[in-house]
């Protein structure tokens, strides 16, 4: 992300992400913000995978909504940069792994939407915002149930205890994505794109658990393994065109809502404004 420090504009990255990837043989490259689309594309074409870390809230205009009073800080340039990288990666079938904000970015890039503040929009949900410094980043907060036929289950099994540091969540699920894990209150905790070699996002922070939790390490390993593999040959024929049409349809017409119990679980709902990147 970008940040001001003693009058300087800095790009910063949590070292835990870098160490988690480097330990498994990856060569992490931090992509600068504020770049032209052409320059950003030049960097993208040299990558083998895209990792999307946690961070600020995503500007709701990207999924056709007004700002909620409890929306947190946003970063316009980071939103723009990550949306471009994510959409390009999904179009190409390049492996993608998203953490916390990262899974939300994957969803928005595919035409989905977010709850801008979980507890004000649904008071019946459990607490998910165990933020530091009040809580340790590695604090186990709840369990997730993982779909047994998912890529995530291959890494983490069918049930897993996770940390939780978010006040937003997945609402309308984007095109080509499937909810593959839920918290005990029904809130989506992970998404993946079954048609692609590896496109997975989780709402928790596995990098904070990886030192003592082999299953969290497995998730990073599977991403690195996919990035080093022959993913360029695995994307389905016609996927780019299919994705563009599907993403546009979802963002215009609504789609399956993700949660159980408190919200609709199926059907076309509303007509949110078109996401700018779905074109």
What residue ranges belong to the model's regions?
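N-terminal beta1-alpha1 cap of cysteine-dependent amidohydrolase-like domains
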Residues: 1-97, 108-115, 119-156, 161, ...
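Glycine-rich beta-to-alpha active-site loop
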Residues: 98, 103
